[in-house]
């Protein structure tokens, strides 16, 4: 398993229009970090279960990058959507945003898979179905803990499990 495999899997899933639209809706409504959710799902697709400690490390490792780089790029690109004179600039921002997201994937990878706790925080579970592992893993993201947003989490698993 490598960060490149995770990134390629994420891009393939994100290229599906219904999946992308749903993830972007959750990003807007719930402040979901799409790539964090995709990482949780990707681990499940690889029959890996992660513990809350790994999800917490991920959040700490990515927060500054998200706040300082990814979110401002996205917000500016969205704000410029209605101005046709800024179309070329918007396309450039989108390229920068994808590059920033790629770096975010590396931060996620390093926080979880590069940790000395990886052997206890990410466990191989070949006996558990992919959809179940995806559900468990997404449920460990702070946004979805304590039974929050169960229907949204379930729909996300359905969309991504079908594509796996």
Model-derived features: where do they sit?
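N-terminal interaction modules that seed assembly of large macromolecular complexes
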Residues: 20-63
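A charged, amphipathic interaction segment
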Residues: 78-164
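Short acidic alpha-helical/loop segments enriched in Asp/Glu that coordinate divalent cations
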Residues: 50-56, 74-82
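An acidic intrinsically disordered interaction segment
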Residues: 1-16, 68-78, 99
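Residue-level detector of well-ordered alpha-helical segments, enriched
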Residues: 22, 31-38, 69-72, 89-92, ...
């Amino acid at each position: 398993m490598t960060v490149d495999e995770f990134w390629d899997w994420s891009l393939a899933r994100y290229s599906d229009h219904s999946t992308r639209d749903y993830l972007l809706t959750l990003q807007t409504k719930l402040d979901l970090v799409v790539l964090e959710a995709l990482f949780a799902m990707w681990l499940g697709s690889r029959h890996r279960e992660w513990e809350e400690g790994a999800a917490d490390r991920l959040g700490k490792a990515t927060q500054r990058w998200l706040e300082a780089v990814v979110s401002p790029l996205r917000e500016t690109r969205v704000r410029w959507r209605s101005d046709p004179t800024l179309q070329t600039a918007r396309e450039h921002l989108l390229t920068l945003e994808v590059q920033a997201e790629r770096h975010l994937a590396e931060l996620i990878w390093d926080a979880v898979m590069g940790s000395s706790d990886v052997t206890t925080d990410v466990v191989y579970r070949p006996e558990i179905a992919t959809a179940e592992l995806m559900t468990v893993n997404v449920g460990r993201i702070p946004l979805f803990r304590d039974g929050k947003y169960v229907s949204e989490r379930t729909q996300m698993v359905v969309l991504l499990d079908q594509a796996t």
